[in-house]
């Protein structure tokens, strides 16, 4: 594993670009103080106490031109995010001053950090394991308080502790197998029986199954619930989107076909992050642009975790309504009867022949009635008994982790199959070792450089 001395000193802007109260430029590496002292006018930062904030100015040493008035936060290794020497320069927000300071840092010994490189160093230097490093990005991207709480639990190491406990259990079994193989002549050595190996495989598999039982909810919390709002034109889809978002994101008019494309937005519905997709009204049309929007709408239905099918309660069912009801029959859906503020003309008896009325919710987006009930129903559909968790309040949210847990589970099934077939214990232990290795990939106890490059490239600059 690389050590801090093998790394260049890196720098990046940690705050979003644009105007703001402050901007932060982060520097990390063994040459941090050599770089900063060349451009910082004030106290000698190489001598100040760690974890202090120091007032001063950034000055171009070549022109002696003052660039900005700043506060510099000094943090010495190893008690930093990267376990390297770190300085964070807080300057006035804005593109010009921030970029000028960054360029001075880069021209005096640092290089530009790659996306996620600060967190990558935290992993390589042993401050975080891989699952904790991934939780950093989950925390940044959290859309709801529930998402944030799950990410914080993972960052605190809850998942890591459980995985390492399982790996240690497996390692203990493998050690006993090795002793039994290497020293079969010693009667005092505890014999690893087929029964004992089977019991341990069953025990670990139960823990993995408990983790996997949280995966569905966890994936929703991490990635959001892809929710398609569909219906024929002018039934109130865009009005529903705007109401859920509490802002006018979609154009609302009486003209059918106004929404020509798919609009995507995230919204927090009682702790459930919904990735709302407002689709173009689905109907037969000769308009080329609208036709493209309709085709995208149909694709959105296929990709959705939840379909909100909006019908107009003030109009009789149309052939397009019936087609959409049939097309979404196998989808997880809620059928919304909108415009209940107007006289009802939709035949409820006919609707009952096409859909289970328990899936139907009446509402008037215009009068803001029924929206609370819609939010309650969505939350109940996916979190009926609240947030599931396994031992120690652990939830699995990451698709990579889910895949590795399934591979570990399969390896344990192979152990059971081998034992049932009467295979020698020394052969069965190969599958037990595979399980141990798959679990190790979750925490990064075993990894490939290509995996690290792929994971950390998804991070933002400065993190």
Curated annotation (Swiss-Prot):
GO biological-process terms attached to the record: tRNA methylation; tRNA wobble uridine modification
Cofactor: binding comment: Binds 1 potassium ion per subunit.
Domain of life: Bacteria
Disulfide bridge map: none
GO cellular component, one term: cytosol
Record: residues binding K(+): 234, 253, 255, 258
Subcellular location: Cytoplasm
Alphabetical list of Pfam families matching this protein: MMR_HSR1 (PF01926), MnmE_helical (PF12631), TrmE_N (PF10396)
Matching CDD domains: trmE (cd04164), TrmE_N (cd14858)
Similarity comment: Belongs to the TRAFAC class TrmE-Era-EngA-EngB-Septin-like GTPase superfamily. TrmE GTPase family.
NCBIfam families: mnmE_trmE_thdF (TIGR00450), PRK05291.1-3 (NF003661), small_GTP (TIGR00231)
UniProt protein name: tRNA modification GTPase MnmE
């Amino acid at each position: 594993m690389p050590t801090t001395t093998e790394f260049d000193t890196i720098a990046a802007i940690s705050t979003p670009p644009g105007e703001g109260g402050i901007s932060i430029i982060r520097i990390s590496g063994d040459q941090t103080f050599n770089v900063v002292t060349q451009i910082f006018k004030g106290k000698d930062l190489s001598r100040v106490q760690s974890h202090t904030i120091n007032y001063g100015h950034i000055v171009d040493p070549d022109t002696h031109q003052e660039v900005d008035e700043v506060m510099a936060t000094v943090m010495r290794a190893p008690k930093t995010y990267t376990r390297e020497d770190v300085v964070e320069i807080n300057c006035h927000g804005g593109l010009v001053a921030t970029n000028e300071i960054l360029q001075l840092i880069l021209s005096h010994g640092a290089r530009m950090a790659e996306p996620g490189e600060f967190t990558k160093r935290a992993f390589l230097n042993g401050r975080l394991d891989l699952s904790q490093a991934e939780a950093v990005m989950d925390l940044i991207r959290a859309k709801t308080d529930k998402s944030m709480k799950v990410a914080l639990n993972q960052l605190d190491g809850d998942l890591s502790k459980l995985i390492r406990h399982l790996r240690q259990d497996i390692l203990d079994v493998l050690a006993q197998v090795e002793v039994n193989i290497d020293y079969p002549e010693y009667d005092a050595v505890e014999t690893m029986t087929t029964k004992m190996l089977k019991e341990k495989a069953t025990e670990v598999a139960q823990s993995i199954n408990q983790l996997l039982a949280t995966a569905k909810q966890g994936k929703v919390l991490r990635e959001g619930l892809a929710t398609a709002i569909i219906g024929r034109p002018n039934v109130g889809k865009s009005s529903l989107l705007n109401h859920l978002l509490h802002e006018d994101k979609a154009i609302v008019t009486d003209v059918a076909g106004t929404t020509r494309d798919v609009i995507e937005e995230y919204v927090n519905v009682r702790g459930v992050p919904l990735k709302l997709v407002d689709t173009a009204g689905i109907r037969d049309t000769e308009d080329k642009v609208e036709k493209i929007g309709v085709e995208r709408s149909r694709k959105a239905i296929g990709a959705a975790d939840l379909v909100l099918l909006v019908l107009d309660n003030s109009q009789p069912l149309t052939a397009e309504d019936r087609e959409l009801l049939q097309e979404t029959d196998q989808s997880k859906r809620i059928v919304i009867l909108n415009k209940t503020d107007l006289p009802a003309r939709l035949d409820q008896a006919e609707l009952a022949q096409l859909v289970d009325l328990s899936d139907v919710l009446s509402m008037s987006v215009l009068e803001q009635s029924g929206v609370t009930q819609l939010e309650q129903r969505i939350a109940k559909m996916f979190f009926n008994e609240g947030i599931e968790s396994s031992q120690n309040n652990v939830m699995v949210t990451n698709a990579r982790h889910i895949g590795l847990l399934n591979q570990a589970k399969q390896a344990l099934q192979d152990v059971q199959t081998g034992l049932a077939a009467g295979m020698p214990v020394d052969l069965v232990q190969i599958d037990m070792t595979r399980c141990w290795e798959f679990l190790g990939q979750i925490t990064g106890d075993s990894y490939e450089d290509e995996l690290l490059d792929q994971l950390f490239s998804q991070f933002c600059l400065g993190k």
